[in-house]
């Protein structure tokens, strides 16, 4: 499986505070581990298919990671809140 962090993901992470950036990084690492090894999610992590190949992962209620999962390719697209994810999906 191949993982790619899109420039839009990197740009979106810059808007967070340092402690939130660390939480986003930890969640992304957990997702990579879970998807590459076909492991179950740990408690406290939500994973939801949104539309088409777009999925959302979250740990807690505030911060979400939007990624596109197409076969063997996982592209991390955006980190943000619920409204950021909805706004992105409306335009893509």
Where are these regions (language model features)?
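Enriched for short, Lys/Arg-rich terminal
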Residues: 2-4, 11-15, 21-22, 55-92
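Proteins with a high burden of low-complexity, intrinsically disordered sequence enriched in S/T/G/P/A and R
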Residues: 7, 20-21, 35-36
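Generic recognition of well-ordered alpha-helical segments
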Residues: 11, 26-30
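Hydrophobic alpha-helical segments and their boundary regions
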Residues: 15-17, 27, 41
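Short, structured coil/loop segments at alpha-helix boundaries
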Residues: 17-25, 47, 51
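Extended rod-forming repeat segments used as scaffolds/tethers
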Residues: 27, 45, 90-91
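A short, surface-exposed loop/turn module that caps and links secondary-structure elements
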Residues: 30-58
């Amino acid at each position: 499986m191949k993982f790619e962090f899109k420039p839009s993901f990197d740009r979106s992470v810059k808007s967070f505070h340092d402690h939130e950036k660390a939480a986003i990084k930890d969640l992304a690492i957990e997702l990579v581990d879970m998807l590459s090894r076909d492991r179950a999610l740990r408690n406290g992590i939500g994973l939801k298919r949104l539309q088409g190949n777009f999925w959302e992962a979250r740990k807690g209620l505030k911060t979400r990671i939007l990624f596109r999962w197409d076969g063997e390719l996982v592209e991390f697209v955006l980190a943000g809140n619920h409204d950021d994810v909805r706004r992105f999906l409306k335009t893509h």
